């Protein structure tokens, strides 16, 4: 089934080239189907790349999704045009009286700041509080996961001596959890962050369950009661080239950046990246949508 997006959204052409079924809102209105309402709060500066990455994954399911893109009203985005935001995005004020089946909160390059120092923290707190009563399930990614764990459960983040950067092996910590249906006991996921949350802190909160962990990268997947809140500290949505682009960006700036681990063939940045996380990335998003959104949401929101 398709994802329903604006016919002029640039990501639409990218997805169509990959044979991912997308549908315009105009066509969807002619069908007698109750599509799932999914909001994506896009905190990334590279908004169009993130749009394509997430739409690629949530579009690879049997479910019909009506996607709403959100941006922070209290933050000035410098890497995307105002025209793009005006054409394709809404703010929280635009949707605060609506209910959604699912919400995705992305990462953001602000992890070295204290949460309270982030210029849109107050607005984000309102959105996370809203999600508790107006969203069936919320998936938090990377810094978005750190922010959610901190806001909802008081779990702190800690600075790392070295950036966790690359593709890392993870072990499933809990069997027979719906979010991990079909997962291998060992699987890969990308990480790109300067801070961490710690296993002991997660296990110290009785409402939280640690689902997947990595010896090198640390905590990856955590879930709250009844799956209302899901936290992914890694970046299972990343495309093949994303880590390469981040590495080349920082290298060209003269920053002290290591080659991403377990990513390039033979660890040689002149060779092609080796994708080892795609299948589990698709499985993570499809399980979330199926078991924690579609199976749990009421027909009438």
UniProtKB/Swiss-Prot annotation:
Positions annotated to bind substrate: 163, 192, 249
Compartment list: Cytoplasm
Residues of the site described as Important for acyl-CoA specificity: 111
Site label Important for substrate specificity, positions: 192
Active site, UniProt feature: 142 (acyl-thioester intermediate), 235 (proton acceptor), 237
Pfam family, one: HTS
Keyword DNA-binding: no
GO cellular component, one term: cytoplasm
Pathway assigned in UniProt: Amino-acid biosynthesis; L-methionine biosynthesis via de novo pathway; O-acetyl-L-homoserine from L-homoserine: step 1/1
Enzyme Commission number(s) from the entry: 2.3.1.31
Catalytic activity: L-homoserine + acetyl-CoA = O-acetyl-L-homoserine + CoA
UniProt-listed PANTHER family: HOMOSERINE O-SUCCINYLTRANSFERASE (PTHR20919:SF0)
Name of the protein in its database record: Homoserine O-acetyltransferase
């Amino acid at each position: 089934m398709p994802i329903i997006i604006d016919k002029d959204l640039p990501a639409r052409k990218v997805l169509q080239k990959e044979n991912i079924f997308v549908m315009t809102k105009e066509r969807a209105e002619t069908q007698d189907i109750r599509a799932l309402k999914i909001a994506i709060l896009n905190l990334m500066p590279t908004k169009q790349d993130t749009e394509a990455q997430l739409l690629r994954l949530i579009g690879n399911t049997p479910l019909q999704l009506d996607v709403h893109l959100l941006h922070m009203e209290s933050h000035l985005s410098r890497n995307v045009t105002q025209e793009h935001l005006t054409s394709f995005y809404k703010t929280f004020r635009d949707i605060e009286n609506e209910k959604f089946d699912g919400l995705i909160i992305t990462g953001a390059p602000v992890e070295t700041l204290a949460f309270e120092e982030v210029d849109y923290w107050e607005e984000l707190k309102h959105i996370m509080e809203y999600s508790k009563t107006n969203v069936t399930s919320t998936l938090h990614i990377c810094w978005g996961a750190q922010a959610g764990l901190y806001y909802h459960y008081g779990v702190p983040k800690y600075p790392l001596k070295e950036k966790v950067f690359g593709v890392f092996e993870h072990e499933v910590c809990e069997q027979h959890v719906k979010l991990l249906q079909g997962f291998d006991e060992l699987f890969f996921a990308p990480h790109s962050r300067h801070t961490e949350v710690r296993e002991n802190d997660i296990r110290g909160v009785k409402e939280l369950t640690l689902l997947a962990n990595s010896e090198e990268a640390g905590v990856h997947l955590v879930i709250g009661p009844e799956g209302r809140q899901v936290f992914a500290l890694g970046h299972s949505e990343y495309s093949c080239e994303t880590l390469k682009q981040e590495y080349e960006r920082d290298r060209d700036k003269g920053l002290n950046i290591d080659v991403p681990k377990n990513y390039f063939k033979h660890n040689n940045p002149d060779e092609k990246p080796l994708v080892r996380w795609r299948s589990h990335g698709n499985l993570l998003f499809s399980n979330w949508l199926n078991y924690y959104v579609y199976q749990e949401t009421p027909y009438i929101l």
